[in-house]
């Protein structure tokens, strides 16, 4: 190992010369000229080898060039090539031309002729501006050989430096051989001394190993005895601590249990006392409640019996009314069957007439639809009391549309026809409004056009107001807008009042109003809705309608219906409802005894309601 360290140290000392030897591969700068051959011998004799460096500095290159035996032309060539910034192969055309000028100047300077200065800042034109034709031709000859001269100069320079380097390398190798011989002898002496030292070291290590073995055995025995003693001591301490903990836990558990038992006994005693007291209080309350309930049951026993009797009587009356309703419904079913048979016969008859007349089903359907539409619109216009224009429009448009559709001409459907009628009425109203506004603007006195309202305006004279006070009672709940008589007539007609539907006013029975009893219904079964009566003078103005057998049959069925019987029993009789109060606090719905205000249950003014 020591030999290798010495070799590395010697190599590090010679690193500078080796690096200088390989510097020519970098191609960074032109190499300086090698020193003359006369100067190499004294350098080799003294053992000093110059470093191989390539510098572009002119002074160093010239100092080396002076040491070599060169002609003035070669020296000039070396100086010119040393000033180049690039390699010979990397020169541009302009740089090559300037190199030719510099080489031509060297030739002229050696021959004593005129030179032409040319620097880096000057262009090639400025460098060759003063040349005549002969000089120009000579310059071209030199310029064509400029790259070759550059290569030759560089090779010559490298050859001189290589010779110098090889000579220095030989001198260094000789000195290294002498140093290696001395190092070899020192290594031999070192090896002998190292072997003797190793022998002595091995003997000492053997004796020391024997002593360490004896000490190890004694130490192991001592460790084993100490470990065994410590284990026994730890076990004894653990047993002692475990016993103490168990004893402490037992004592603590016994103490806690005693405290818990004492507290539980106290709590249970208090709870038992409180429960006993609460039970006594509850028993007292239950006893009082039972006494109150018993007293109330004694008081309400008669009321329950009376209510049971009332319920039985009501049930009997209900069954009787249900029997009447059942008979009425049977009669209605029989009548409907007869009516269906008649309608089928009439339809067969109409069908036969149509087949005999040769009419088509489509034309018949068109006529039926337009007739129904005409009747519906006529009723609606009459109900709304529209103007004559709307009625005339309906009277003209519906037949014309039906005739056009039967003749397969352009016709409107019912929806379009409705929109047409509505548009015409609305357009007329807008025109009247516009005319009224124009007349008002011009200052004319013109009556306002009629509004599209349901009820037409009427003048209210004192005579009519007096008649209205006589005809319409104050207890009417129907809102009056324009004409109360018309409202009553419309309501009576819509509700099916027999005074309007009948053939003559003499068939209308007189109507009596009920006494108001708290605003609640006073009968257990539904009754006819109370309506305003119409005077005989108003009935005279109603046109008589003979509906034939159908109206008579309806009147007969209505007279035999349970509603008519209820209405006759509730509205046409002079008996009022009972003024008593039932057990539930509701007014009694039974009829009062003749000449009294109470029924048989509440006779004497007593109520069946007893407060608890």
Swiss-Prot record:
The places in or outside the cell where this protein is found are: Nucleus membrane
Q: Where is the composition biased (Low complexity)?
A: 556-574
Major location category of this protein: nucleus
Q: Which GO terms describe its biological process?
A: karyomere membrane fusion; pronuclear fusion
Compositionally biased intervals (Basic and acidic residues): 457-470
Outline the segment boundaries, as ranges, of region: Disordered: 452-476, 555-574
Question: Span of the secretion signal?
Answer: 1-20
Q: What happens when the gene is disrupted?
A: Embryos arrest development shortly after the midblastula transition. During cleavage (2-, 64-, and 1,000-cell-stage embryos) all blastomeres of mutant embryos contain morphologically abnormal nuclei that appeared fragmented in formation of multiple micronuclei.
Q: Which GO terms describe its cellular component?
A: nuclear membrane
The name under which this protein is listed is: Protein brambleberry
- Which source organism does the UniProt entry give? Danio rerio (Zebrafish)
- The gene for this chain is bmb
């Amino acid at each position: 190992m020591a030999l290798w360290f010495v070799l590395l140290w010697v190599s590090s000392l010679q690193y500078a010369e080796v690096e200088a030897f390989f510097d020519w591969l970098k191609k960074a700068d032109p190499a300086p000229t090698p020193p003359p051959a006369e100067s190499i011998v004294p350098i080799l004799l003294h053992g000093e080898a110059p470093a191989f460096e390539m510098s572009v500095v002119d002074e160093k290159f010239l100092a080396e060039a002076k040491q070599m035996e060169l002609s003035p032309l070669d020296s000039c060539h070396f100086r010119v090539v040393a000033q180049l910034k690039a390699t010979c192969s990397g020169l541009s055309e302009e740089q090559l031309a300037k190199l030719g000028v510099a080489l031509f100047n060297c030739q002229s300077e050696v021959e004593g002729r005129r030179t032409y200065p040319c620097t880096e800042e000057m262009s090639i034109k400025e460098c060759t501006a003063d040349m005549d034709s002969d000089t120009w031709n000579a310059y071209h000859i030199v310029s064509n050989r400029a790259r070759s001269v550059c290569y030759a100069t560089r090779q010559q320079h490298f050859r001189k430096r290589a010779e110098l380097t090889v000579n220095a390398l030989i001198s260094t190798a000789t000195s290294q051989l002498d140093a290696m011989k001395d190092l070899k002898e020192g290594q031999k002496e070192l090896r002998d001394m190292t072997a003797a030292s190793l022998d002595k070291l091995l003997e000492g290590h053997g004796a020391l190993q024997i002593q360490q073995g004896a000490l190890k055995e004694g130490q192991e025995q001592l460790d084993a005895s100490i470990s065994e003693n410590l284990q026994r001591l730890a076990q004894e301490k653990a047993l002692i601590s475990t016993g103490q903990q168990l004893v402490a836990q037992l004592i603590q558990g016994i103490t806690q249990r005693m405290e818990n038992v004492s507290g539980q006994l106290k709590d249970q005693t208090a709870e038992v006392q409180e429960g006993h007291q609460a039970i006594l209080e509850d028993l007292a309350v239950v006893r009082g409640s039972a006494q109150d309930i018993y007293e109330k049951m004694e008081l309400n026993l008669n009321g329950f019996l009376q209510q049971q009797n009332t319920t039985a009587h009501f049930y009997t009356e209900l069954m009787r009314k249900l029997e009447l309703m059942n008979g009425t419904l049977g009669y209605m079913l029989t009548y409907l069957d007869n009516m269906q048979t008649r309608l089928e016969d009439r339809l067969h008859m109409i069908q036969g007439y149509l087949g005999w007349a040769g009419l088509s089903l489509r034309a018949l359907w068109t006529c039926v639809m337009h007739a129904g539409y005409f009747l519906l619109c006529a009723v609606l216009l009459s109900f709304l009391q529209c103007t004559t224009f709307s009625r005339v429009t309906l009277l003209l448009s519906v037949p014309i549309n039906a005739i056009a559709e039967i003749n397969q001409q352009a016709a409107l459907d019912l929806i379009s026809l409705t929109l047409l009628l509505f548009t015409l009425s609305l357009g007329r109203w807008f025109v009247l409004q516009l005319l009224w506004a124009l007349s008002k603007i011009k200052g004319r006195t013109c009556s306002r056009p009629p509004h599209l309202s349901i009820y037409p305006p009427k003048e209210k004279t004192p005579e009519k107001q007096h008649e209205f006070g006589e005809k319409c009672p104050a207890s009417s709940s129907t809102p009056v807008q324009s004409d109360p008589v018309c409202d009553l007539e419309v309501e009576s007609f819509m509700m099916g009042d027999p005074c309007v539907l009948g053939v003559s006013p003499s068939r209308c029975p007189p109507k009596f109003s009920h006494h108001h009893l708290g605003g609640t219904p006073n009968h257990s079964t539904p009754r006819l809705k109370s309506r305003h009566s119409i005077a005989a003078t108003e009935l005279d103005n109603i046109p008589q309608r003979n509906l034939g057998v159908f109206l008579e049959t309806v009147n007969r069925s209505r007279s035999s219906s349970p509603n008519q019987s209820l209405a006759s029993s509730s509205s046409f009789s002079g008996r009022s409802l009972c003024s008593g109060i039932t057990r539930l606090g509701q007014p009694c719905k039974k009829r009062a005894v003749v000449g009294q205000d109470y029924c048989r249950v509440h006779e004497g003014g007593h109520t069946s309601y007893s407060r608890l």
